């Protein structure tokens, strides 16, 4: 089987790959549009002259400016960290659908608070609004990947969870370009910097409206004992009847997994909490999930997202307009590469190989950019234009983006959404999202100080971390593409890690063939299907 083949766990009717699952994933992913926009717009908005003038930037020392910038950016991540954990009880008792609604409402309240800020009132409303917005997106970053992964057929689960990442990049693209637009078309004023803050309300409003029409996760309904509603929702999503052999297999697998969990860990609210800290198998996967986000943030991506003007200034770009334009192009590159990742790479190349290639290529690019800054010291360039070396540095920066985006940007979210048992999934995703926001907070809080003290060493620091992630992934992270959620336990128990995927998939195919043979011998004929994808054929 080629690494470029899409892997099905069993013959799948064409009706399963329908527009409904893509629509549900797209609606839920307005959450990530909120996250992406907030991550992108804030760094360039606070660099606008109109913002600096209104909040008396010139009266602050350089150290104070760095501190205030870091606080404005990082209080959002602090809120998101706690929001990710608050999402666990909400997701357990209220479900994924209404959890997403609540996260959008809290975010909207935070965005509204920020709009009340001005020079007379000071930055307090921005700080408070950023914390509330962070609470909302932190909870949303828990609910959305789980919701999508629980709806998705295994063969396209990576693609569907990848819609969450695409939403992040689309929001980021708007966030990067909006400040270039207001800087070019509006005179410095209160409105100029307020408009980027107001645009936050658009994806939040779309999510609130969309959530009213989506279906609750069938797997959550099964977990809560609402069986009839769960089967009804699953049939609607799959577009096949409950007595179809595919549905019989899927419902049977869910029932079997829940029964196993009921007899071991338990299905309540408190038992998973206890199990998470005492069960070595679960602790190990929590460690893997948290470390994936450590390596992701250690690549330097959020230093660039939040402080892109500082990053491009270190390479030698002069002028706010040039910095905003270059940042906008950075957003375009990320979005285009994310679309390729979503449509093809994540479910064909798989998670593991993408992480390895991205870490190796991205590390090389960071070493080159850091070495250029060390040798040339472009910040002392008296010319208004980049020289040849500066252009080359910008090229390697964008090449780093092309390596990083289809690997470490969204793949850790995909893996974390699929590698846990159903009764522990909400708690595990809370821990995963919380760890992302913790590392995110640390990077965003100290990036200005790192650039002030380390200069080119910042790039060497990020390059080293990307290099260290390679043995971690190779020896510890198995491939998960095409593996049903109910089969993650044997996948993570199979050794060696680099052969686990092939071994487990072979066992799944063997079990599925035996199940269908037994059904045929019993006289069951309804719902025979042909496999949609030939998994031994190159796409």
UniProtKB/Swiss-Prot annotation:
Protein name, as recorded: Probable quinate permease
Q: What does this protein do?
A: Integral membrane transporter that imports quinic acid to be catabolized as a carbon source.
Membrane-spanning segments: 23-43, 75-95, 98-118, 131-151, 160-180, 194-214, 286-306, 326-346, 353-373, 388-408, 457-477
Complex formation:
Interacts with creB.
Membrane side Extracellular: residue ranges: 44-74, 119-130, 181-193, 307-325, 374-387, 478-539
> What Gene Ontology terms describe what this protein does at the molecular function level?
carbohydrate:proton symporter activity
Task: Please report the PTM annotation for this entry.
Answer: Ubiquitinated. Deubiquitinated by creB, probably to control its activity or amount.
**Lineage of the species this protein comes from:** Eukaryota, Fungi, Dikarya, Ascomycota, Pezizomycotina
The similarity comment for this entry is: Belongs to the major facilitator superfamily. Sugar transporter (TC 2.A.1.1) family.
A cellular component annotation (GO) from this entry: plasma membrane
Please name the gene that encodes this protein.
qutD
């Amino acid at each position: 089987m080629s690494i470029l083949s899409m892997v099905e766990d069993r013959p799948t009717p064409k009706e399963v790959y329908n527009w409904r699952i893509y629509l549900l994933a797209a609606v839920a992913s307005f959450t990530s549009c909120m996250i992406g926009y907030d991550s992108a717009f804030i760094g360039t908005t606070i660099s606008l002259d109109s913002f600096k003038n209104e909040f008396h930037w010139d009266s602050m020392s350089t150290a104070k400016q760095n501190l205030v910038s870091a606080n404005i950016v990082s209080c959002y991540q602090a809120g998101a960290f706690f929001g990710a954990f608050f999402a666990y009880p909400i997701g357990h008792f209220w479900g994924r659908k209404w959890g997403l609604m609540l996260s959008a409402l809290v975010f909207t309240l935070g965005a509204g608070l920020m709009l009340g800020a001005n020079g007379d009132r000071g930055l307090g409303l921005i700080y408070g609004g950023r914390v509330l917005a962070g609470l909302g997106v932190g909870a949303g970053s828990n609910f959305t990947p789980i919701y999508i992964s629980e709806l998705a057929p295994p063969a396209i689960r990576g693609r569907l969870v990848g819609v969450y990442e695409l939403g992040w990049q689309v929001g980021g693209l708007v966030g990067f370009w909006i400040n270039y637009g207001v800087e070019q078309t509006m005179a410095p004023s209160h409105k100029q910097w307020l408009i980027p803050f107001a645009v936050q309300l658009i994806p939040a409003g779309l999510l609130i409206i969309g959530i009213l029409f989506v279906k609750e996760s069938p797997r959550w309904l099964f977990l809560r004992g609402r069986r009839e509603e769960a089967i009804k929702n699953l049939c609607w999503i799959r577009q096949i009847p409950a007595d179809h052999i595919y549905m019989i297999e899927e419902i049977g697998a869910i029932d079997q997994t829940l029964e196993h969990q009921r007899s071991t860990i338990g299905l309540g609210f408190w038992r998973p909490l206890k199990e998470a800290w005492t069960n070595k198998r679960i602790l190990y996967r929590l460690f893997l999930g948290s470390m994936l986000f450590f390596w992701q943030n250690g690549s330097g991506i959020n230093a660039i997202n939040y402080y892109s003007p500082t990053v491009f200034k270190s390479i030698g770009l002069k002028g706010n307009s040039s910095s905003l334009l270059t940042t906008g192009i950075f957003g375009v590159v990320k979005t285009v590469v994310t679309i390729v990742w979503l449509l093809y790479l994540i479910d064909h190349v798989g998670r593991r190989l993408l992480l390895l290639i991205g870490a190796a290529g991205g590390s090389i690019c960071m070493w080159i950019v850091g070495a250029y800054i060390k040798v040339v010291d472009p910040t002392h360039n008296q010319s208004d234009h980049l020289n040849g070396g500066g252009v080359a540095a910008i090229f390697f920066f964008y090449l780093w983006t092309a390596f990083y985006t289809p690997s470490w940007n969204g793949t850790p979210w995909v893996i974390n959404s699929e590698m846990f048992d159903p009764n522990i999934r909400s708690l595990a995703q809370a821990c995963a999202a919380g760890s992302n926001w913790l590392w995110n907070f640390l990077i965003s809080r100290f990036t200005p100080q790192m650039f002030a003290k380390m200069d080119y060493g910042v790039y060497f620091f990020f390059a080293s971390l990307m290099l260290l992630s390679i043995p971690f992934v190779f020896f510890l992270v198995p491939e998960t593409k095409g593996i049903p959620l109910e089969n993650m336990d044997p996948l993570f128990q199979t050794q060696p890690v680099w052969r686990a995927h092939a071994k487990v998939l072979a066992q799944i195919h063997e079990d599925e063939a035996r199940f269908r043979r037994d059904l045929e011998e019993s006289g069951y004929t309804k719902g025979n299907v042909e496999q949609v994808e030939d998994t031994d054929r190159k796409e």
